[in-house]
Amino acid sequence: MRKFSLAYLTIPGTNPMDQIRIAKECGYDSVSLRTISMHLPGEPEFLLDKDPALFAATRAALKEYDMPLMDIELARIRPDLDVSEYESAFEKAAELGATDVLGSIWTRDRAWYTETAARVADMAKQYGLRYNIEFLPWAGVRNLQEAITLIDALARDNVYIMVDTLHAGRAGVTAEELARTNPKYFNFIH
């Protein structure tokens, strides 16, 4: 049975408590929160690992609305970011029952991003999280084939491709190509 989670970018800038309430009111099965800083000017941050009051309010809202937390985002791999800083976000997500983390890669240095993605995957696994890598045509992993190559290189049982249909279309990925791809690579779509 297909389930639907309210992704953060559907209503960007919305605090976790309101996003959880909106997800419930709209009939979603779960919610996806952005709890990792994007380091973008003017973007609100909802860092559950750094703000105990926000964490408690988010936990209370999940319970009040009986709304599971599916995933957190966005664990980016970029040369100027230290991925070890994601661990506290993964820990708090797991405490709230999350099953997944969404990530993306922003460098073309394949050896470096493969090694770094392995670290993120292993860190996520410590908290029972699946690591879902999104490809974008202007990022480091630009298309479905590059994502498959990375997943195969990582050889970990908690790493998947997250297909954002908007970006897949921009990358020239067809429905036929997706249908021909082994479903073992996929966990969820946007």
Question: Where in the sequence are the language-model features?
Answer:
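Acidic/histidine-rich catalytic cores of soluble enzymes
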Residues: K3-L6, R119-H190
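Active-site groove signature of glycoside hydrolases
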Residues: A93-A111, Y127-L136
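Conserved strand-to-helix beginnings and helix N-cap segments that scaffold or border functional pockets
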Residues: P16-M17, V83-Y86, T114, L144-Q145, ...
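Active-site beta-loop-alpha junctions enriched in small/polar residues
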Residues: A7-I11, R34-M38, L74-I77, I105-R108, ...
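Active-site-adjacent beta->alpha loops and helix N-cap segments on the catalytic face
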Residues: A53, R108-V120, G140-N143
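N-terminal pre-domain/capping segments
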Residues: M1-D100, K125, R156
